[in-house]
Structures are given as C-alpha cells and as structure tokens.
Amino acid sequence: MKGGQQAPSALRVVVADDHHHVLPEIHAAIRRRLVPFQGVHVLHFDAHPDLSFPRSVDPALVFEPHALYDALDESVSGIAEFLLPLVYAGHVNQLMWIKPQWATQRLCVSLPLLHFIEEDAYAAVDAMASETIKPWDFFITELPDRLPSVSTHAPSSAIVDGHDVLAQLQRKPAQAYILDIDLDYFSTWNPFRKDLEQRVGAATANIVAQVFTALRYRDMGNGMSIAARSQDRRSFVAALGQLEDQKATQANDPSVFDPSSLVYQSILNTLTPLYRDGVDAPDLLTKFMNLMGTLDHDARQLVWWAGPNLDLPHHMSSNDEIERMVAALRDFLVDIATTNGKSAHPPSLVTIAKSTGDEYLPPHQLEFVQSRVLRCLRDVFGDLDVEFVAYEDVQDAEDNANEE
C-alpha cells in the first residue's frame, strides 16, 4: 500500500519482508532514472553481509531480471543473494557493510575473506574470465559503541562519524547512493540455532556448532593458503555429505555410527585433521557420531540444515538498546547529509527489509523497530514516500486462484 500523495521531493522508501524482494524495486528505480545506471554506492545496515550468490544459477541471469527474481525466490538463501547481482551488472561499484557489534562473523571474488570461501565464491584473479571481472570497493565497519549493555566492543577501525564514511565514499566517484537497512541490524535472532535448541537442547546444539565451526580453514590467522582453505572446506563438506547420505539410505541401521565400521572410520579419518589445534577432534566427532545415531530423521535433517549457520549472530536487543542504535543511525545520517556545513544529496532510494518472516528480526519487535527507523528517516530527510511491498508465494497464489 502506498502512503498518500507526497511532495515530488519526498524520499522514496521501499519496505519488504524478505530482503531480496527489494531488488525489483532497485531495478525499477534504475529504469525510472531515480537511481543511476552505474556508479552507485550502497550503505548496507545489516547483521549479515548478504554477499552470496547461488552456485547453481547461471550468472547470465543477472541480465534477465525476472528470471533472476524467480531464482532468488527458489534459493534457500535468496535473502543474502541480491547485492552481488547489482555489482556484477555494473550498477554498484562500492558497498559498505555497517554491522552491529554482535555480528562477529568474518568475511570472493578475488577477496580471500572467510565469507566468500564458505560460499565457495572465491577465485584468484588469474582464474577469472577477464571480460567478466567487475572491480568494486568493499568496506566493513560499525557505528560508535552506544550500547553499554553489549559486551563486545567496536574495533579500532570502527567509524567515528558519518564524515569518515563520506571520505570512503569519495574514494571512487559516485552518481548516487542507496541506503539499505535490514531491521535485523537492530535486534538479531539466529533462527537456525533457536530451532535446533528447541528440538535437541542447548548442549546438543553446542556439539553440533563445534563440529561445524571449530575447523582450521575458518581461522584466518593461521597462515593457511587460500587454496588449502578451499580444499579443507571441500573435504569437510564431502565427508559430512557422506555421513548424511549413509544415514539417509540406512535410516534404521545404526551400524553407520559403529566405531568399528569402515564408513565410520573413513569419515573420522577424513575429518580429524581438518580441525584447529587444541580441538580434541576424535572426541568431538565421536560425540557427534553418537548423537546422530540417536536422532530421528527429522532431527537429523535439522542438524544438516542448521549446522553451517550456527555461528550467525544472535542477540535480541532491549528496547533501550534499539533506541540507542536508532539514535546512532540518526547521528550518522545527519553527518553524511551535511558536509562542511552544506547540505549533501540524500540517498536516491531507501530500501528496508523487515526480516520477520524468517525470524532474523524477532517478530514481536517489528512494530517498535520499524516505527523508530521511519521516524529517524523523516527527522533527517523530511517527507517520505513509503511503499510496503508484499510478495505472495507463486504456489499459494495458484492455490488461491483455484479456490476462487
């Protein structure tokens, strides 16, 4: 529903639930010349980097928007896969991820950060097709610490104010910038951990988390080469896949978890050297194998689904924390909207993801967070043209049509 008749100068704000559903609105803004075709910077406030791309999708779909939208809807992680298509298409040449202080996940592309290795998206420059390379600037930072009750602290490289961001934005010429806000920036659930703990308990979830996160390739300070990290990751995925397949085909046969079985020993021998120094891998893996042997099919499937995501941030903010973060956002936006006492351009477009459908934002906090963010935007930029975009699942739409 579109909010009323607005002055021509009103700032357009698009609000969707799933984050990737802002992509059609960005493309529409480009077509309407509200956003330039290229040279766009994105300020991305989010508890997650959202820099994935589905490996099964042909990159050519980046230039076929409707097919791309369908692919993202079908992808299990489509909400994290809407930004890189904008880079690959040449629209965005700089992205700044501004994260909350509890988002400690480490972030290819030719950038050998853990996020890209995990997503199997890293490639050395000389392994890329030269005509497809799209150079872009990427920054990660935080707003000043305004949450006294949060135990983590901003690193020394954290932003002091919006002028620091402006200096970074000016490193590369920009035609305009998009302000992109995921409301889970202000309060974050990890739905994977929450669902797993509810099903199998916190102690079991902790064992699963160690199996998936205590791996040496995830330690970016141990001197491993990128090739070795990538190989370790592939070995880990293959071994866990073997275990999953064995249990799927022998659902009622516990022998796959018998320490004397060849399958068990093969998987154990493959996985043990993949763990960090100081981790008792045989003991950890034995606990995990024993655990998996006691779970029913649905619980095992939950482990495979949740395991790779148990290190995602999880911090439900109090109302006071949220108010402080919104105040920090307001200060930040005022800083970048004013340069040397002169008014600077507002964003060409604001996109907001509610993220309550998948519960990355605790659903009961939506109204509180959303109302304060919109009020913040009005305080800084004046009139807003707010549109709430709703998307219906294709199958649901067909079912409803058949009922009619």
Positions of PLM-derived features:
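Conserved alpha-helical scaffold segments that buttress catalytic/binding sites
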Residues: 1-404
